[in-house]
């Protein structure tokens, strides 16, 4: 892959529009896996996705020009999957499986276009919503977040000259490489890039992926970014996300359907994929409730991704549950992915070493850690906690509780109803930075 002078590219403002998202493959792999299942099983379900800025002190509408945001969103809507991309999706092996994507699905995907968006300003923030069929709106999540985060980075750097930009990126590269050198000291480490949605920029994410590939070799297992996986000959990684149980819960007609929603998702998933993709995401409505009500067959799955509890606490809870179901944790897999940086990776690795198989999905602190890198402090370069979540399904409000109350989303009355139904035990309040 040709090298790019990122600082020079940032400084060059000659073009009218420098597209942030240039391919529909510039997304997380699990969006495509989920999309195929949504297309196959829930074609008549409508779902709204909405931007949520959890860092409320940052007024996005004051930092990002509305015209530039609309131009980037409009450009993303012009994209289609290319012939090369379709051939790669059809012919490549993913998770050891050939033709993981059905020919009928790929025929449908060939003409896919991102749906229209609804954008307005309110109290210094952007209200951004995507309405329509679930099989269309789900694909806005990653590009919308990538666009807003990169526009914020560009706005923060717009007054920096070539020399200051050189210093900024030189320091960021040195900071990133020092993390790589620490990761080298962890034998048997398995780590992947999960940093697309809140990255500093596409070019920076690509550099970070190349640095990991060069610096830690086989310990770097791949990237969630499908375009980068294709371009750099890496494994495309990812399983499923909270939106699946959130939508099924929103559609529930009674208490039994609500209670069983997280497990019906897993049954659907097993029908479509199975094998190495049998990873449980347990925290949509609280991990404690999930484990308490889980059918025995859940313990047969490959592993869990504890996504919102502190990693050591969350991992220990799942290990104890496996033991209670007669399973040997050393044969199971834990994938840690919540707000990780090198300190928490080292601590978690050393805590669980030899007790369970581990993998780490490194996100925002991999692809957007510029704190202290500019010649003078620039607040706009600090990563924020920005998400794009499903907020209703067929007109019914969607809710996520999480193991961290700070990450709960949904109408407050519905959140209270879900808490009463699923329980509030073992949820731990933590500051959300990214």
UniProtKB/Swiss-Prot annotation:
InterPro entries given in the database record: N/Namide_PRibTrfase (IPR041525), NAPRTase_N (IPR040727), Nic_PRibTrfase (IPR006406), Nic_PRibTrfase-Fam (IPR007229), Nicotinate_pribotase-like_C (IPR036068)
A GO cellular-component term linked to this record: cytosol
Functional pathway: Cofactor biosynthesis; NAD(+) biosynthesis; nicotinate D-ribonucleotide from nicotinate: step 1/1
Keywords recorded for this protein, A-Z: Ligase, Phosphoprotein, Pyridine nucleotide biosynthesis
Catalytic activity: nicotinate + 5-phospho-alpha-D-ribose 1-diphosphate + ATP + H2O = nicotinate beta-D-ribonucleotide + ADP + phosphate + diphosphate
Post-translational note: Transiently phosphorylated on a His residue during the reaction cycle. Phosphorylation strongly increases the affinity for substrates and increases the rate of nicotinate D-ribonucleotide production. Dephosphorylation regenerates the low-affinity form of the enzyme, leading to product release.
Enzyme Commission number: 6.3.4.21
Function: Catalyzes the synthesis of beta-nicotinate D-ribonucleotide from nicotinate and 5-phospho-D-ribose 1-phosphate at the expense of ATP.
Protein name: Nicotinate phosphoribosyltransferase
């Amino acid at each position: 892959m040709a090298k790019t002078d990122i600082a020079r590219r940032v400084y060059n403002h000659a073009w009218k529009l420098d597209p942030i998202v240039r391919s529909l493959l510039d997304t997380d792999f699990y969006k495509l896996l989920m999309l195929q299942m949504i297309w196959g099983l829930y074609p008549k379900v409508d779902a709204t996705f909405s931007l949520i800025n959890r860092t409320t002190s940052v007024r996005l509408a004051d930092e990002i020009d509305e015209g530039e945001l609309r131009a980037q969103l409009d450009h993303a809507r012009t994209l289609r999957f290319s012939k090369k991309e379709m051939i790669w999706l059809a012919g490549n092996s993913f998770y050891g499986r050939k033709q993981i994507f059905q020919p009928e699905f790929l025929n449908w995907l060939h003409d896919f276009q991102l749906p229209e968006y609804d954008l307005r300003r309110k109290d210094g923030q952007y209200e951004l919503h995507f309405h329509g069929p679930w099989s269309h709106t789900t694909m806005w999540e990653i590009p919308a977040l990538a666009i807003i985060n990169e526009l914020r980075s560009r706005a923060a750097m717009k007054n920096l000259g070539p020399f200051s930009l050189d210093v900024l990126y030189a320091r960021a590269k040195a900071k990133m490489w020092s993390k790589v050198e620490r990761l080298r000291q962890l034998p048997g480490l398995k780590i992947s890039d999960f940093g697309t949605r809140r990255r500093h920029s596409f070019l920076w994410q690509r550099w970070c992926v190349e640095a990991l590939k060069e610096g830690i070799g086989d310990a770097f297992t791949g990237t969630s970014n499908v375009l980068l996986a294709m371009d750099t000959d890496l494994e495309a990684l990812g399983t499923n996300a909270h939106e699946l149980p959130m939508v099924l819960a929103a559609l529930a007609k009674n208490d039994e359907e609500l209670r069983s929603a997280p497990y019906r998702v897993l049954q659907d998933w097993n029908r479509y994929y199975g094998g190495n993709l049998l990873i449980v995401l347990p925290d949509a409505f609280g991990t404690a409730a999930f484990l308490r009500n889980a059918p025995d067959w859940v313990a047969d799955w490959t592993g869990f991704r504890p996504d919102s509890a502190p990693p050591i606490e969350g991992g220990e809870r799942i290990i104890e549950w496996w033991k209670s179901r007669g399973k040997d944790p050393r044969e199971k897999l834990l994938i840690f992915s919540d707000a990780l940086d090198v300190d928490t990776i080292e601590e978690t690795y050393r805590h669980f070493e030899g007790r369970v198989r581990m993998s780490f999905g490194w996100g925002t602190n991999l692809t957007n850690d510029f704190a202290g890198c500019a010649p003078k402090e620039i607040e706009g370069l600090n990563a924020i906690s920005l998400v794009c979540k499903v907020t209703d399904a067929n007109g019914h409000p969607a809710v996520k509780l999480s193991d961290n109350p700070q990450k709960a989303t949904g109408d407050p009355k519905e959140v209270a109803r879900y808490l009463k139904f699923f329980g509030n035990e073992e949820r731990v309040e933590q500051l959300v930075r990214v």
